[in-house]
Amino acid sequence: MPKKLILKNFLSPGDIVMLTAAVRDLHKCHPNQFVTDVRTPCPQLWENNPYLTPLDEKTPEVTALKCEYPLIHRSNSLPVHFLHGFVEFLNEQLKLQIRLSAFKGDIHLSEKEKAWFSQVREIAGEDIPFWIVVAGGKRDFTIKWWDLWRFQEVVNYFRGRILFVQVGAREHHHPALQGVLDLRGKTDLRQLVRLIYHAQGVLCPVTFPMHLAAAVEVKGGGPKNRPCVVIAGGREPSQWEAYPHHQYIHTNGALWCCDDGGCWKSRTVKLGDGDSKDKPDNLCVDVVGTLPRCMDMITAQDVCRRIKLYFDGGVLPFLTRAQAELTRSFVSRARFIDHERK
């Protein structure tokens, strides 16, 4: 009789993408031994998942397990990825031998979803290649933010060659870029999954869309793995976060504060919100202006070069002249003022 499990985790969407991989490989490595369901804040990430069966936690034969990933506390010194976190936890808790079958999470789109027009096509009237850009992040982890003006430099550099689509949750910090298609606050989790399915590439810090870039199926006609450029700095050890086909720009080993893995700090300055992230041991020790030095060391030119690699290598084409002309009719003309910049 298969063991009935409800796996629980109530952390951020990026963490839940990691859990999807563990569920996938629980069933692949131990077929017909488990019936699984989940309890997470992100039910949209589990839509069409073939490994889930609705279970009632009140049923006596059902075991509920709060899933964690204590492996993170050894990530600075071990050759392990975030994907291994829940896998190791389940192995220890259930006495199993789960092994990762793929270097990515497990997000499933239906054939109907894949046939729908993207939000970009709905606006443009035709399919246009585009990159998703995330130029901010959650307000509680300011150490992950890069300079808005540098994001703008990147957008400006590729103007007429790449259409950038800016996304971000309304409740998070995502200041407006100029010359982009602005979809900030206009995508729920499932819409973001579908948008990434259609995307040519992703530009972001270490965040949820980075994990989706790897986990979401690549639309036919493109490379086998979706291009993604990640502005990472030195907060996390690179081996814990980076995917093989991404351009992951990190500074591990270049600064004393991250010379032996990541610093795992949370903020550059106190926010006064009562959160433990305001404690001195959670604050960056090397701040340049408003940025941690590890992020300040990464220039717009560094990022442009990494994006351009995908085009120079031939796996991606730039916009055609006609496509570039079409984008001018709907990209954002938003202006922004940074009062801290002189």
Which residues are covered by each model-predicted region?
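Catalytic machinery of carbohydrate-active enzymes
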Residues: 1-342
